[in-house]
Amino acid sequence: MKDRYILAFETSCDETSVAVLKNDDELLSNVIASQIESHKRFGGVVPEVASRHHVEVITACIEEALAEAGITEEDVTAVAVTYGPGLVGALLVGLSAAKAFAWAHGLPLIPVNHMAGHLMAAQSVEPLEFPLLALLVSGGHTELVYVSEAGDYKIVGETRDDAVGEAYDKVGRVMGLTYPAGREIDELAHQGQDIYDFPRAMIKEDNLEFSFSGLKSAFINLHHNAEQKGESLSTEDLCASFQAAVLDILMAKTKKALEKYPVKTLVVAGGVAANKGLRERLAAEITDVKVIIPPLRLCGDNAGMIAYASVSEWNKENFAGWDLNAKPSLAFDTME
């Protein structure tokens, strides 16, 4: 059987990425051009800046991905692309490049949900067994997803307000940490003590919903009040207390979901899945099901994960037309 090569594109936010996947599971290349340095001074992603950067580097990323994979344009079998959720301008750059490549070479175009990409990045660790449950944690999303089979995703719980990664970045900004703040808060948390009593919203409620706005507000109020009084607070202890509250919420809801949906596998994915504290809690507390977390290089936004997610769509021949458009608010269906 002839080898299949999928060329995948990811430009939903501030990473321009192009990857090549051979057959179902051999990631030959995963080129990522990060824009973090451009957005640091703004304390967050500026959509217009992100779009312009994507335009500047997308062609070079395609060339590098093909070269690193050791294939030519003529070897590509199909093109996969993120079409949502994300920043509309950023998404359109990847969509335009993917459609142009597919059209020029007469190839099928595979539409991929960005969050499905995060989830299916776990396929790089080992073949996934369905049904499974996934905890998706990133800068824009916090959700529990039930996956009955590859490509069939249903939300069973999600945040009512801030995403967990968003909360990390906002409290990081208050402390004067560098954007994105997640890694630094995690590192500082391991040097401090959980001495500040922050709220754990909805932790005892009988649902699978998350809420981080109250925790974020409590943190900001404590920090500002201390500043106004001229008091000095330990940054390490603040980070340790904040992260302890976040992880308590995530763990409580995940355990509740595992009780409700008896599965053998839990996938934890998204940018926040790189968090050392979260990985430690999962290893210590989730012992009755298999926990699969993508490698660090596949936790953040990257086209490799989009390639993995595209395989199930390829198998179903779920191809898009040339009218495929960006869907910035694209979401999985909710479990009824």
UniProtKB/Swiss-Prot annotation:
Single Gene Ontology MF annotation: N(6)-L-threonylcarbamoyladenine synthase activity
Required cofactor names: Fe(2+)
Principal location class: cytoplasm
Reactions mediated catalytically: L-threonylcarbamoyladenylate + adenosine(37) in tRNA = N(6)-L-threonylcarbamoyladenosine(37) in tRNA + AMP + H(+)
GO biological process, one term: tRNA threonylcarbamoyladenosine modification
PANTHER family in UniProt: TRNA N6-ADENOSINE THREONYLCARBAMOYLTRANSFERASE, TRNA N6-ADENOSINE THREONYLCARBAMOYLTRANSFERASE, MITOCHONDRIAL
UniProt family annotation: Belongs to the KAE1 / TsaD family.
Protein name in the entry: tRNA N6-adenosine threonylcarbamoyltransferase
Organism lineage: Bacteria, Bacillati, Bacillota, Bacilli, Lactobacillales
